[in-house]
Regions:
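Intrinsically disordered, low-complexity regulatory segments
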Residues: 1-169, 173-175, 473
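C-terminal or mid-to-C-terminal helical accessory/interaction module adjacent to the motor/catalytic core
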Residues: 87, 100-101, 142-225, 268-272
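Amphipathic alpha-helical transducer elements in NTP-driven molecular machines
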Residues: 9-16, 33-36, 40, 59-62, ...
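Basic, low-complexity terminal or inter-domain segments flanking catalytic cores
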Residues: 2, 81, 88, 125, ...
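C-terminal helical "lid" subdomain and adjoining coupling/linker elements of P-loop NTPases
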Residues: 186-193, 205-248, 291, 315, ...
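Metal- or metallocofactor-binding catalytic centers and their adjacent structured scaffolds
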Residues: 243-279, 285
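Conserved short loop/turn motifs at secondary-structure junctions
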Residues: 1, 109-111, 188-193, 268-277, ...
Length: 699
């Protein structure tokens, strides 16, 4: 018997149908010589410090550097304790039995670093010795699964990928555990969350936020001149920016007095805008956020769903290129789009004999090629799924179309010794931009409709005004700009080639960045204000401590990610990486233990353990190293006073506090209470009896 293990039940069912396994059992499907079973995500992970005999947060325990790591079934919290998830334990028992009976195992977990780790951790935990081979496919279509099963690869081909995944997992454990505990000790206990990837990401958001808020806008003035030729009016802007209104008005008077403006230079250039590269996951997430407001996690979830429904290829890809053999399939995929209503007309006009080859490069593909639609066309999709599907399908058509050609005109004009400029553009060939037929975003001041103008033209000054402007700070990060910053380890690169070159040295991977961002929301370090990412007071309190520490070094984190990529390709050995992480961890633990965090001990006793509570500018923390009680000062965007904090901790409830802010705007009044898990929650005063009576009467 052969055992096939998929990453989740839905994928297992698809594979079972292909291999003829139809007999459903508890935890697997069997038939035709196969047993098709599944994990459900990470069934096995690294044990917490308690399993190594290390309890509590104590200075003398740090740094915690296990000589070897203990694997355990996935844990769930019950009260203050963690225990093995019963469902996971049951499935591991089924896997143990199946693996023991198998002639060989076919590994069909996701074809990537994390998918490899999911299987290898299970295999190691079960102490299995059954030989295994790898099913490595880029889509879940029936054809792809059949071809993959006919070309199974030896399991040891992916040993380096596993070593990279294992090194990443252990590095995250070592850095996260030690950094969080060191900061907790330095802060007087409580629970703090730091991580190898999470904290530099937080630093990117916070640094931009503080820069934005500290920005002092400068006012300047520009002249806006109206002129015309042959009945076509247009406006031009002064190149000079005046630092005062009086200077601008004086220049304006000179221009009006001159009555004419002379064209001193006309430059016309043909601009060829090459088609964009195919999507990788990060680029898809960035554009879905900027165009539709989708979070990175939402885009990934939709893309994963489309993949599992066989409509697109493997989504967790970091490549924007396809190989020569995949390129041979593109004409058929374009032909397929003639049956998809939105793209039918355009796809029918494409000349598949002369397609752009900009995204075809064998050397720029690692595990998976760029995102593509499959041969399967969707018939019914909800609005959000349709958006993401059409982004992927539309991008394929754009990528293999011709360039967009424009004729750009740049004018320089002069009046009364003051220079003015204007820019116009005429579309010569729409090219790839005809796929979506969306307007090109241009800055209003940069584009104008120009008549036929030649150097030496003397044109009338039909009007001249002053425009008051202000310098602007760099905007707060959105998920789109944050993903771009993570991709390049904080470097701002607009050149596509430079961004591609930096990919292996970014923060996180395409598969993990959405989860990193969502962790920041889950831990209330960041909130969304429209599309902008705003750090909470909790987040700023952490950043104030770590901003100059190695744990927040964005470039260093990018270097670690590059090292992990080299382990996967065999260019670096995992033990060297591990030793480097241990040295780094020892350094950050020392730095954080020496951190000074201001706080004042109060007379308030901890409601959980009775030990003294320390009041800090952003929070109150219990001093007991084994307690970890933390109450944050800012609730509903309102900062609690020491008196309100003390009342909450001693009585379990405050009086009514006015001025909490709703997520959507507006304020409300409420009392605060501590629940049985010592979490803060709102308590609203009941409505008065007469109003309730009227409401009941209406019913």
């Amino acid at each position: 018997m052969q055992v096939i293990i998929a990453e989740k039940p839905s994928v297992a069912r698809e594979i079972a149908a292909i291999v003829g396994a139809t007999n459903r059992k508890d935890g697997f499907i069997e038939g035709n010589g196969y047993a098709v079973t599944w994990a459900f995500g990470h069934l096995v992970g690294l044990a917490m410090p308690q399993q190594y005999g290390i309890a509590g947060f104590r200075r003398e325990n740090l740094p915690i550097l296990p000589s070897s790591f203990i694997l355990l079934p996935r844990q769930v919290r019950e009260g203050k304790e963690y225990k093995a998830d019963p469902g996971v334990v049951k499935q591991l028992g089924i896997l143990r039995e199946l693996f023991g009976m198998a002639e060989r195992i076919i590994v069909a977990t996701d074809a990537g670093r994390e998918g490899e780790l999911i299987f290898r951790y299970i295999y190691s935990y079960l102490e299995c010795r059954t030989p295994f081979v790898r099913l490595w496919i880029s889509s879940l279509t029936d054809r792809a699964i059949r071809e993959g099963l006919q070309h199974l690869r030896p399991g040891n081909e992916y040993d380096n990928l596993y070593l990279s995944a294992k090194a990443r997992s252990e590095a995250d454990w070592i850095v996260g555990i030690n950094a969080s505990q060191a900061l907790a000790v330095a802060a007087g206990r409580g629970v703090w969350s730091l991580g190898r990837v999470q904290t530099p990401t937080l630093a990117i958001i916070c640094s931009r936020y503080l820069e934005n808020k500290a920005f002092k806008p400068a006012t300047y003035f520009r002249l806006k001149l109206s002129t015309a030729k042959e009945g076509t009016e247009f406006t031009v802007l002064s190149t000079e920016k005046f630092d005062g209104r009086e200077k601008a008005e004086a220049a304006r008077a000179e221009v009006i007095g001159a009555r004419t403006v002379r064209v001193v230079n006309v430059e016309r250039k043909e601009a060829r805008e090459q088609p964009p590269l195919l999507y990788d996951l990060t680029t898809l997430q960035k554009e879905a956020n900027s165009r539709y407001g989708f979070s990175a996690e939402k885009t990934l979830d939709i893309a994963q769903s489309l993949y599992e429904k066989k409509f697109i290829t493997y989504p967790r890809t970091g490549s924007r290129y396809i190989s020569e053999d995949v390129a041979e399939e593109i004409p058929a995929l374009i032909g397929n789009m003639t049956r998809y209503p939105r793209f039918a007309e355009y796809a029918g006009r494409m000349d598949t004999a002369s397609l752009s080859r900009r995204s075809v490069d064998n050397e720029k593909i690692a595990d998976h090629h760029a995102l593509l639609p499959t041969e399967n066309l969707p018939s019914e999709l909800d609005a959000d799924h349709r958006i993401v599907y059409e982004m992927v399908a539309g991008r394929m058509l754009e990528t293999f179309s011709g360039a967009c050609v424009k004729e750009n005109t740049f004018l320089t004009l002069q009046s009364a010794g003051h220079d003015f400029t204007a820019r116009g553009s005429i579309m010569v060939e729409t090219g790839w931009r005809a796929v979506l037929n969306e307007p090109v975003e241009e800055k209003e001041e940069d584009m104008t409709l120009l008549p036929d103008i030649v150097q030496g033209d003397e044109l009338p000054v039909k009007g001249c005004g002053t425009e008051q402007k202000q310098t602007r700070p760099r905007p707060l990060h959105t998920e789109s700009s944050l993903l771009a910053a993570m991709e390049t380890a904080g470097r701002e690169l607009s050149d596509e080639a430079e961004r591609e070159a930096m990919k292996d040295a970014g923060i996180g991977t395409p598969a993990t960045r959405a989860a990193i961002i969502e962790t920041l929301f889950a831990r209330e370090y960041v909130r969304r204000e429209k599309k902008s990412l705003v750090p909470t007071d909790k987040r700023l309190a952490v950043y104030a401590v770590v901003r100059d520490k190695k744990i927040a070094d964005v470039a260093m984190t990018g270097g670690w990610e590059l090292a992990l990529s080299k382990i996967a390709t065999g260019e670096m050995d995992a033990p060297t990486f591990h030793r480097g992480i241990e040295v780094f961890t020892s350094q950050i633990a020392k730095e954080l233990l020496e951190a000074r965090i201001d706080g004042a001990e109060s007379d308030t006793a901890c409601p959980r353990c009775g030990r003294p509570v320390v009041f800090y500018p952003k929070l109150a923390k219990c001093q007991n190293p084994d307690c970890g009680l933390t109450v944050w000062r800012t609730v509903g965007r309102k900062e609690l006073t020491d008196k309100q904090l003390a009342e909450l901790l001693t009585k379990g409830k405050t009086g009514t506090i006015r001025g909490f802010v709703k997520n959507g705007g507006g304020t409300f009044d409420a009392a605060l209470t501590l629940d049985d898990q010592f979490k803060t929650s709102f308590v609203f005063e009941p409505r008065d009896t007469p109003r309730q009576g009227k409401r009941n009467k209406r019913k």
